[in-house]
Amino acid sequence: SVGFKAGVKDYKLTYYTPDYETKDTDILAAFRMSPQPGVPAEEAGAAVAAESSTGTWTTVWTDGLTSLDRYKGRCYQIEPVAGEENQYIAYVAYPLDLFEEGSVTNMFTSIVGNVFGFKALRALRLEDLRIPPAYVKTFQGPPHGIQVERDKLNKYGRPLLGCTIKPKLGLSAKNYGRAVYECLRGGLDFTKDDENVNSQPFMRWRDRFLFCAEAIYKAQAETGEIKGHYLNATAGTCEEMMKRAVFARELGVPIVMHDYLTGGFTANTSLAHYCRDNGLLLHIHRAMHAVIDRQKNHGIHFRVLAKALRMSGGDHIHSGTVVGKLEGERDITLGFVDLLRDDFIEKDRSRGIFFTQDWVSLPGVLPVASGGIHVWHMPALTEIFGDDSVLQFGGGTLGHPWGNAPGAVANRVALEACVQARNEGRDLASEGNAIIREASKWSPELAAACEVWKEIKFEFPAMDTL
């Protein structure tokens, strides 16, 4: 008889393998799945494994031409989610050979491709990925990483300070450059193009690059510190994006910027390679992330997007504030902040980390805290994020009653006061307000900032809970 038997058979017969021992080279995924009523968890988990690897809805003749055992994804464990009805965490192991080397794009096309539209599931969310060292090693990763960046900037022992230039749309290039200069002159390390500033009719990219470069050099000369402005190279085509990055390099500026989700992983990886070859730092903005990661039971958790960015390449990435106006629950945020910075991260379910991740020697990424933060948040930010971070105050700099430069001074004084207090062994969590008040006695700029923002809070419950 012929070995081929046509017809539809249950996924779980082939793809649910509870006895499977995961290999060190497997990519492991944790999915939060909500099956349709009446679909057993094992069948749903097996369906996820099948549809994101070798399976299709019916047996096909060509299955006989390959070795399914070698190439199939396997659902090897299923656990119910506490407190949720009919929701499970399904663990899936993928053989390494299913993925193209050095391609985040291909990895995502497989793991989070068609399977998310699968009818037997009401919802599906990718909670975490374990990237094996064998696969990590096929990626260049961040152009420079944390240590090289500090050496380039000659700034040690404290978080870096930034500011997004507002209003985000509508300024002319010359006025934009002026705002950049004032912020850098006041004491910030970086200023930033807003993520939606690309090359619009009111300010074409080349004009902006030129005026910002002038601002950087003038501020450097006057302060004796290295300064940078994240020049947004994001564009409608990869070629245009590269053209902008090349122009930035010709101006001799230290850093460019990219919106990695709207620009796409392929473009981002190309830009990251260019940045390493040409000594440019790369700042990454995560515009569009909340579309993908904010729903609790469908989509992709940001920790996965953060891991993907570390593989694709970026030296800074926005990662929530814990205290400002945007999403972020403390333990979970710190979980993916560590995934960005550290070489080795232990599995820790209380922080949402489903797998131990070994990055081997892939450089780290600086997390950027940005969004609704001001001087009163400085002690908490210094405490939560530590030295290896970038703290960005947009409105918290430009909204200062006396102008941009005094706003920058206020932030820098607050930061230096917090770092000094921490180094003296004081507890920033309990003494934070006192530390800021004390510092404001000898800094009128800080005193004015303290007055303006003394009552501002963004108190809503976080959605990103376990």
Swiss-Prot record:
Substrate binds at residues 114, 164, 168, 286, 318, 370. The record marks 325 as: Transition state stabilizer. The modification N6-carboxylysine is found at residue 192. It catalyses: 2 (2R)-3-phosphoglycerate + 2 H(+) = D-ribulose 1,5-bisphosphate + CO2 + H2O; D-ribulose 1,5-bisphosphate + O2 = 2-phosphoglycolate + (2R)-3-phosphoglycerate + 2 H(+). Gene3D superfamilies: Ribulose bisphosphate carboxylase, large subunit, C-terminal domain (3.20.20.110), RuBisCO large subunit, N-terminal domain (3.30.70.150). One of its GO terms (molecular function) is monooxygenase activity. The active site is at 166 (proton acceptor), 285 (proton acceptor). SUPFAM superfamilies: RuBisCo, C-terminal domain, RuBisCO, large subunit, small (N-terminal) domain. RuBisCO catalyzes two reactions: the carboxylation of D-ribulose 1,5-bisphosphate, the primary event in carbon dioxide fixation, as well as the oxidative fragmentation of the pentose substrate in the photorespiration process. Both reactions occur simultaneously and in competition at the same active site. This is Ribulose bisphosphate carboxylase large chain. The lineage of its organism: Eukaryota, Viridiplantae, Streptophyta, Embryophyta, Tracheophyta.
